[in-house]
């Protein structure tokens, strides 16, 4: 079973959604280029002002977290998170997960 964590970063949208999407997309692109972790941006079906970034199977959490923090700062994406960004880390534990 893999021990590489997946990151789930959720927050409530603050400000203009188009501007936020541009900043977050640029941030995620930097993360993908700089450390090879491709993220996905999602929103809740019942509350489109709640967004989540998903980064799966992060092999080097220290480098990933540093790169994410730098990209977050560079693109000013934190300004679009009302109440801050909530970061959660999960690892696979299911019977069908690859060992």
Q: Residues of each region from the PLM?
A:
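Short S/T/G/P-rich N-terminal loop/turn motif that feeds into the first structured element of a domain
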Residues: 1-50, 55-69, 86-99
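Acidic/histidine-enriched active-site and ligand-binding environments that engage anionic O-linkages
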Residues: 78-88
């Amino acid at each position: 079973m893999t021990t590489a964590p997946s990151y789930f970063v959720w927050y409530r949208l603050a400000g203009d959604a188009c501007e936020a999407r541009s900043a977050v997309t640029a941030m995620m692109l930097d993360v993908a280029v700089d450390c090879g972790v491709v993220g996905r941006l999602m929103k809740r079906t019942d509350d489109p002002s709640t967004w989540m970034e998903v980064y799966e199977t992060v092999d080097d959490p220290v480098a990933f977290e540093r790169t994410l923090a730098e990209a977050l700062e560079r693109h000013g994406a934190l300004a679009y998170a009302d109440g801050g960004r909530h970061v959660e880390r999960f690892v696979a534990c299911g019977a069908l997960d690859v060992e």
